[in-house]
UniProtKB/Swiss-Prot annotation:
The gene is DYNC2I1. This is Cytoplasmic dynein 2 intermediate chain 1. Keywords: Cell projection, Ciliopathy, Cilium, Cilium biogenesis/degradation, Cytoplasm, Cytoskeleton, Disease variant, Phosphoprotein, Repeat, WD repeat. It comes from Homo sapiens (Human). Belongs to the dynein light intermediate chain family. The keyword Cytoplasm applies. GO terms for cellular component: centrosome; ciliary basal body; ciliary base; ciliary tip; cilium; cytoplasmic dynein complex; cytosol; extracellular space.
Length: 1066
C-alpha cells in the first residue's frame, strides 16, 4: 500500500458485485445465460451516476493488466528506481481520474436521491438473488482439491511476501510519508502490548480500541439502519445456506476461475449504488433510528464492531508467512473450513468491510507462531478501519485526503498509486488462496457439523474468496462473555464474602516441661516406681485427677405431670426414670425464714458488740429479776419526741412487737408531724423497726393476724378500722430520705372510715381482736363460708371491733386474687394496688344485755375490752366499767354464766381494765380492775376462783398478761410503774417478785417468750417508758423455764380453790 494513501471502499471488491458474479457462474453454464445476465447488470449499472460508468465499462483485459502490475512488483527488486518512476506516472493519471470522479459526485448528489426509491426495491430483489448465489457457491468450493489449494496457497503467499517487501522498502525511502511510519510504530507497540494468541487475538484488542474511539465519536445516523438490515437478513441466510450447502458439490474448478476474472467488472458500480441506497435509506429512517438507537445499536453493533477490525491485519499476516510452510498448512486445515455465513450481515458498503474481517479470522489462526517476525510489517490500521467501515463520515474526509495528494509531488503520487494497485492484486491472490484452502477442508467440516438451529450452527457464504471461521469466533465470543459474567459474579461475591481473622488458635501447643516432670525424668526412675492412686490413669496431664464429668442436655417441664418430666438426646425407658422427690414447700419456706432471722440476729449481735457504750447503757436499766436487758433504737429522727401509748405482741411470732407512738411534741418532719406512727419491731434486731406505719387518726388499739403476722389491724378514735398489709411493695408507699438513711412509711391498705356508715362504729374503738379457727377442736360451731384449710392458712379469718357504746362488729378479712394499681370503683376504702379488704359480717348490740333494771342511777354501761376463748372462738367475754364481765356467743346462744362477778356483792363503779385468757388451753382467765383487785375466773363459774384485793396496794392495774412459757406465772403492772410477778405454784396469796421502775415512768408492758426453743425457754418483758424509750428485760431462768408437770399441778390447785367456793355459795 502506498504511503500516505488511506484505503477506501473503492480499493476492495464490493459484496453486491461479488454475489451477482457468483450467481452468474453457478446458475448458467451456457454463454447465452451469461450474456443475458451481463445485459441485465448493464441495465442496472446505467441507472447509476455518470461518475461510475467508467469502472462499469472495464474490459476483460483489466485482469491481465493487474497481473502485469503484479509481475512488475516482483521484478521491482532488480530495478527499483525505474519501476518507481513508472509507478508514479500511473499514479498521477489515476489521481486525475479520481478528482474528476469526485467532482461528478458533487454535481449528481441530488440526482441520486430521486432514484433511491426505485433502487431500494431493486436492491431487495438483488439481495434475494445473492442469497441463492452464496448458498450455491458453498457447494462449488467443496470441489477444489486439497493439494491444489495448498500449492496455490504457498505460491501466492510467497509472491505476496515479495510484494510486501517491495512496498515496505518504498515506504521507508519516502521522507514525505513519516506519518505512516508513525502509525506503523504505534501498531507494533499495540501488538507487543496486547499480544496475539489463540485466546486473545490481536483483532480483539483492535476491536476494543476501535470501540472506545467510536464511543467518543458517535456514528452517523445510517449506522443503525445497517444493523437492522444485517440482523433481519442473518437468519434467512443461515437457513438457506444450510439447506443448499450440499446440493452444488459437482461443479468444477474451471468455472470458478472464470467467474473470478469477471468479479471486478461490477465491483465499483455496485459499491457506488450501495452507498447511494444507504444514504437515501438513512434519511428516511432518521426518526426511527433515534428511538431505537439505545436498544438495537447496543445489541447488534457489538458483533459488527467485533468483526470489522481485523481485515488489514489478515493481509499483513499473509505477507509475513515465509518461514515454516508445514506449520502454515496445518493452521490452514484447522481454520479454513467454515467462513461463509457472515457476509450477508452488512448491507451496502459494509459488506466489503466484512470480507476483510473474514480474511482476518482465517489468517490470525495461521500466524500465531510468526507474530514475532512480523512486527515491522504491520501498519497502523485504525484509520483504515474507519475508512472501511462504510460510514458516511469517511466519504466526507475523502476530498480532504485527495487535496493532500494533489499537494504532493508528481513522483510521490505516482508511487502511491502503484502501491495501491499492487495491494489490489494481493487481495485477489489472497481470495484465491482462501478458496482453495476452504474447498479442501470445507466439505469434511460441513458434514461433521450437527444440523441444529440457526442460532447455534454457523452458516457459510463466500466473500471474495476470503473465509472466516465464525463458528470458532462465535464460540470464542461466547466464552469471553461467559468468562466476563463469571468474573463479574465472582467480584460481587468477593465483596460479600469476607474472612474473619478475629479468632486465632495454635495447631501445635507444646508447653515446656514443668518441674515435676523434669524431676521425674531425671530422678523418678531411681529406686522408685511411679504409681497412680486416682482413676483415669492413662491421663497424666496437669490438673487432671478424676474421671471426666458426664454431661447431658435435657429439657424440663414444671410442674411435672408424671415421673418423666425431662428429656434429652438420650432415649431411655420410662421405667428408668428417677422419681422426682417431693419437696415440702412450706417447710422449706419456714426454714429459709428462720435461717434469715438467725443471720440477721447474728449480724445485729456483732453490731451491738462493736458498741460497748450502747451495751453499758442497756445494762444500767436491767431489773433485779432479769438476767440482761437491751434497748430498742427509738432515737430515730421520726420517733424523737414521741411518747409510746401502747405495746402489742403476736402469739404466732413471739419475737414481734408493735409500738404505737403519739404525735410529736416538737415539729421535725412536716410530712409526719400530723400523723401517728406504728413501728413493727423484732426484739432480736433492736437497731431499727422492720416496718413503719402511719395513720392520720389516733390509734387506740391494735392487733396482728392470728396465724401469720403479715396483717396489722388498728382501731381509731374516729371509730374506723384500719388494715396494713406488710407484704406490699415499698414502691406503693411514701419514701423519705432522712439523715440516718432511707425509710418507707406505709399507709393503710384498707380503711372503713367514711364507708359502710350504716354498720360502722360511731364511738371510739376500745379493742380489736382476731377470731381464728380453734386449733384444739376439730369442729367449730361457727358458720363460716370458708373451709378450715383456708382459715388455717391465714388468708381468711374474722376480726372483731368493739367500741365504748357496746357495739361489736365482726369483719371478714378478704384477700383479692389480683391487685389493681388503678384502684377499685366499688371498694372506695381500698388503696390502689392493695389486695386486702374488710367485709362486714355481723353486728352484736351489747348495751341491752348489760343494762341493769332498776338501776338507772348508774347510767349506760361502758364496754372496755373484749377477748375470745382460744379453744372455742365462738365464746367471748367483755369487760365493763361496772366491775362486771359479760359472757356471750356470736351465734346468740344462751350461755351460763351470763355475767362474771367479783366476790363482793353489789354493783360498784370499778373498771375491768385488762382481761387475758390462759394460752395453754385451760378455760380460765385473769381480770385486772381499777381498784387494784386481780381475779382468776373459770369459764363455768360466775364468781372468781381466786381474788387478790390488796396485792397492788389498791393501785389500779394497767397491765396483765399470762406468761407465754409457764402456765402458773403471770405478770402485772400498776399505774405507779411497779411490776409484779405471780407464781401460783410457789404462792397463791400474792406476788413472788416486785420491781419499781424509776426514775423514767413505765407506760406500757408486754411479755414475749418462746417455750419451745431448743436452747431453753426465754421470757422477756418489753417496757415502754414515758420518755419514749423501749426496754427489753430478759427474765431469769427461774421465771422463764417451766417446772415439771406444771399444768397438772395448776389444775389441782384450781380444783382445791373451787371446792371451798362451791361450799361457800351453797
Amino acid at each position: 500500500m502506498e504511503p500516505g494513501k488511506r484505503r477506501t471502499k473503492d480499493d476492495t471488491w464490493k459484496a453486491d458485485d461479488l454475489r451477482k458474479h457468483l450467481w452468474a457462474i453457478q446458475s448458467g453454464g451456457s454463454k447465452e445465460e451469461r450474456k443475458h445476465r451481463e445485459k441485465k447488470l448493464r441495465k442496472e449499472s446505467e441507472m447509476d451516476l455518470p461518475e461510475h460508468k467508467e469502472p462499469r465499462c472495464r474490459d476483460p483485459d483489466q485482469d491481465a493488466r493487474s497481473r502485469d502490475r503484479v509481475a512488475e512488483v516482483h521484478t521491482a527488486k532488480e530495478s527499483p528506481r525505474g519501476e518507481r518512476d513508472r509507478d508514479r506516472q500511473r499514479e498521477r493519471r489515476r489521481d486525475a481520474k479520481d478528482r474528476e470522479k469526485e467532482k461528478l459526485k458533487e454535481k449528481h448528489r441530488e440526482a441520486e436521491k430521486s432514484h433511491s426509491r426505485g433502487k431500494d426495491r431493486e436492491k431487495e430483489k438483488d439481495r434475494r438473488a445473492r442469497k441463492e448465489e452464496l448458498r450455491q457457491t458453498v457447494a462449488h468450493h467443496n470441489l477444489l482439491g486439497q493439494e491444489t489449494r495448498d500449492r496455490q496457497l504457498l505460491e501466492r503467499a510467497e509472491r505476496k511476501g515479495r510484494s510486501v517487501s517491495k512496498v515496505r522498502s518504498e515506504e521507508k525511502d519516502e521522507d514525505s510519508e513519516r506519518g505512516d511510519e508513525d502509525r506503523e510504530r504505534r501498531y507494533r507497540e499495540r501488538k507487543l502490548q496486547y499480544g496475539d494468541s489463540k485466546d486473545n487475538p490481536l483483532k480483539y484488542w483492535l476491536y476494543k480500541e476501535e470501540g472506545e474511539r467510536r464511543h467518543r465519536k458517535p456514528r452517523e445516523p445510517d449506522r443503525d439502519n445497517k444493523h437492522r438490515e444485517k440482523s433481519s437478513t442473518r437468519e434467512k441466510r443461515e437457513k438457506y445456506s444450510k439447506e443448499k450447502s450440499n446440493s452444488f458439490s459437482d461443479k468444477g474448478e474451471e468455472r470458478h476461475k472464470e467467474k473470478r476474472h469477471k468479479e471486478g467488472f461490477h465491483f465499483d458500480d455496485e459499491r457506488h449504488q450501495s452507498n447511494v441506497d444507504r444514504k437515501e435509506k438513512s434519511a428516511k429512517d432518521e426518526p426511527r433510528k433515534r428511538e431505537s438507537q439505545n436498544g438495537e445499536h447496543r445489541n447488534r453493533g457489538a458483533s459488527s464492531k467485533r468483526d470489522g477490525t481485523s481485515s488489514q491485519h489478515a493481509e499483513n499476516l499473509v505477507r509475513n508467512h515465509g518461514k515454516d510452510k508445514d506449520s502454515r498448512r496445518k493452521h490452514g486445515h484447522e481454520e479454513g473450513s467454515s467462513v461463509w455465513w457472515k457476509l450477508d450481515q452488512r448491507p451496502g458498503g459494509e459488506e466489503t468491510v466484512e470480507i476483510e474481517k473474514e480474511e482476518t479470522d482465517l489468517e490470525n489462526a495461521r500466524a500465531d507462531a510468526y507474530t514475532a517476525s512480523c512486527e515491522d510489517d504491520f501498519e497502523d490500521y485504525e484509520d483504515d478501519f474507519e475508512v472501511c467501515d462504510g460510514d458516511d463520515d469517511e466519504s466526507s474526509n475523502e476530498p480532504e485526503s485527495r487535496e493532500k495528494l494533489e499537494e504532493l509531488p508528481l513522483a510521490q503520487k505516482k508511487e502511491i498509486q502503484e502501491i495501491q494497485r499492487a495491494i489490489n492484486a494481493e487481495n485477489e491472490r489472497i481470495g484465491e488462496l482462501s478458496l482453495k484452502l476452504f474447498q479442501k477442508r470445507g466439505r469434511t467440516e460441513f458434514e461433521k457439523e450437527p444440523r441444529t438451529d440457526t442460532n447455534s450452527s454457523p452458516s457459510r457464504a463466500s466473500v471474495c474468496g476470503i473465509f472466516v471461521d465464525f463458528a470458532s469466533a462465535s464460540h470464542r465470543q461466547k466464552s469471553r462473555t461467559q468468562a466476563l459474567k463469571q468474573k463479574m459474579r465472582s467480584t460481587k461475591l468477593l465483596r460479600l464474602i469476607d474472612l474473619d481473622f478475629s479468632f486465632t488458635f495454635s495447631l501445635l501447643d507444646l508447653p515446656p516441661v514443668n518441674e515435676y516432670d523434669m524431676y521425674i525424668r531425671n530422678f523418678g526412675k531411681k529406686n522408685t516406681k511411679q504409681a497412680y492412686v486416682q482413676c483415669n490413669e492413662d491421663n497424666v496431664e496437669r490438673d487432671i485427677q478424676t474421671e471426666e464429668i458426664e454431661t447431658r442436655e435435657v429439657w424440663t417441664q414444671h410442674p411435672g405431670e408424671s415421673t418423666v418430666v425431662s428429656g434429652g438426646s438420650e432415649q431411655r425407658d420410662t421405667s428408668d426414670a428417677v422419681v422426682m422427690p417431693k419437696i415440702d414447700t412450706p417447710r422449706l419456706c419456714s426454714f429459709l425464714r428462720a435461717a434469715c432471722q438467725v443471720m440477721a440476729v447474728l449480724l445485729e449481735e456483732d453490731r451491738l458488740a462493736a458498741e460497748p457504750s450502747w451495751n453499758l447503757r442497756a445494762q444500767d436499766r436491767a431489773l433485779y429479776f432479769s438476767d440482761s436487758s437491751s434497748q430498742l433504737n427509738t432515737s430515730l429522727p421520726f420517733l424523737q419526741n414521741r411518747k409510746v401509748s401502747s405495746l402489742h405482741t403476736s402469739r404466732v411470732q413471739r419475737q414481734m412487737v408493735v409500738s404505737v407512738h403519739d404525735l410529736p411534741e416538737k415539729s421535725f418532719v412536716p410530712l409526719l408531724d400530723s400523723k401517728y406512727v406504728l413501728c413493727v419491731w423484732d426484739i432480736w434486731q433492736p437497731s431499727g423497726p422492720q416496718k413503719v406505719l402511719i395513720c392520720e387518726s389516733q390509734v387506740t388499739c391494735c392487733c396482728l393476724s392470728p396465724l401469720k403476722a403479715f396483717l396489722l389491724f388498728a382501731g381509731t378514735a374516729h371509730g374506723s378500722v384500719v388494715v396494713w398489709d406488710l407484704r406490699e411493695d415499698s414502691r406503693l408507699h411514701y419514701s423519705v430520705t432522712l439523715s440516718d438513711g432511707f425509710w418507707t412509711f406505709r399507709t393503710a391498705t384498707f380503711s372503713t372510715d367514711g364507708i359502710l356508715t350504716s354498720v360502722n362504729h360511731r364511738s371510739p374503738l376500745q379493742a380489736v381482736e382476731p377470731i381464728s379457727t380453734s386449733v384444739h377442736k376439730k369442729q367449730s360451731f361457727v358458720l363460716s363460708p370458708f373451709s378450715t384449710q383456708e382459715e388455717m392458712s391465714g388468708l381468711s379469718f374474722h376480726i372483731a371491733s368493739l367500741d365504748e357504746s357496746g357495739v361489736l362488729n365482726v369483719w371478714v378479712v378478704v384477700e383479692l386474687p389480683k391487685a389493681d394499681i388503678a384502684g377499685s370503683i366499688s371498694d372506695l376504702g381500698l388503696m390502689p394496688g392493695g389486695r386486702v379488704k374488710l367485709v362486714h359480717s355481723a353486728l352484736i348490740q351489747l348495751g341491752d344485755s348489760l343494762s341493769h333494771k332498776g338501776n338507772e342511777f348508774w347510767g349506760t354501761t361502758q364496754t372496755l375490752n373484749v377477748k375470745f376463748l382460744p379453744s372455742d372462738p365462738n365464746h367471748f367475754i367483755i369487760g365493763t366499767d361496772m366491775g362486771l364481765i359479760s359472757h356471750g356467743t356470736r351465734q346468740d346462744l344462751r350461755v351460763a354464766p351470763k355475767l362474771f362477778k367479783p366476790q363482793q356483792h353489789g354493783i360498784r363503779p370499778v373498771k375491768v381494765n385488762v382481761i387475758d385468757f390462759s394460752p395453754f388451753g385451760e378455760p380460765i382467765f385473769l381480770a385486772g380492775c381499777s381498784d387494784g383487785s386481780i381475779r382468776l375466773h373459770q369459764l363455768s363459774s360466775a364468781f372468781p376462783l381466786l381474788q387478790w384485793d390488796s396485792s397492788t396496794d389498791s393501785h389500779a392495774v394497767t397491765g396483765l398478761q399470762w406468761s407465754p412459757t409457764r402456765p402458773a406465772v403471770f405478770l402485772v403492772q400498776d399505774d405507779t410503774s411497779n411490776i409484779y410477778i405471780w407464781d401460783l405454784l410457789q404462792s397463791d396469796l400474792g406476788p413472788v417478785a416486785k420491781q419499781q421502775v424509776s426514775p423514767n415512768r413505765l407506760v406500757a408492758m408486754a411479755a414475749v417468750g418462746e417455750p419451745e426453743k431448743a436452747g431453753g425457754s426465754f421470757l422477756a418483758l418489753v417496757l415502754a417508758r414515758a420518755s419514749g424509750s423501749i426496754d427489753i428485760q430478759h427474765l431469769k431462768r427461774r421465771w422463764a423455764a417451766p417446772e415439771v408437770d406444771e399444768c397438772n399441778r395448776l389444775r389441782l390447785l384450781l380444783q382445791e380453790a373451787l371446792w371451798p367456793e362451791g361450799k361457800l355459795h351453797k
